[in-house]
Amino acid sequence: MKDEIISYRQMCDAEKVQTLQRGMNYRLNANYSVILMSQRHNAPYKDRVLSDGMTIEYEGHDIPKTSSDIDPKQHNQPQTTISGKLTQNGLFASAVEDYKLGKRKPEIVRAYEKIFSGVWSEKGFFNLIDYKYITINKRKVFRFFLEETEIDFNAAGIIENKLRQRTRIIPSEIKKIVWERDEGCCVICGATDELHFDHDLPYSKGGASITPDNVRILCARHNLQKSDKIE
């Protein structure tokens, strides 16, 4: 669920895997791909949310560090392996190219973000719509662009719900402030499980997610009660 606060173990369980070791996971299951992102100061890649509040710019991944004398940041991010097989970068880029040629719909990607050590938040589902392969600091890097979408699960898998209103992404720095301010628990009952970052005032009613004053932590029960009152 979007903006749900979860542990690493809960994230893996949600995706029905033992571990998630890669940041990019093309078609982790039959329905969608998965990315792990971070905007922390020590993050290895430059991921960010664009100013529209609904688009993620996600950096591709470096070559593996196979020995101590290899610095991945001095090498181009690869599209293929030495044997010619597509890397995760290549798989994501190929999906974009096929989408642009009208061969397929955009790849659906589920995004999770690391907030603190051991604390993750689901950012929701996105359409993978574009990429660039650009030169930065004398090497080539991938930049993937993902646009937020609303998804419903059904017996056949997943379906895009274009009738549901999209909501802007709560910035990571706001989540960090709110987590510390609310001490990692529901502000109403003090629960410490099934937590969500909640827009205190919905966007449709004039709320914004750019300040901590409009975001709080709620448990699933109180988040549902609030939704019922709004509707």
Residue locations for each model-derived region?
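Long, charge-rich boundary regions
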Residues: 220-231
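Histidine-centered nuclease catalytic patch
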Residues: 189-217, 230
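Short, charged surface segments at domain edges that flank catalytic/cofactor-binding sites
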Residues: 96, 150-185, 209, 213
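Short beta-strand element of the conserved SAM-dependent methyltransferase core
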Residues: 36-37, 144-148, 217-219
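Eukaryote-biased feature marking scaffold/signaling PDZ-domain proteins and nuclear chromatin regulators
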Residues: 104-106, 123, 141, 192
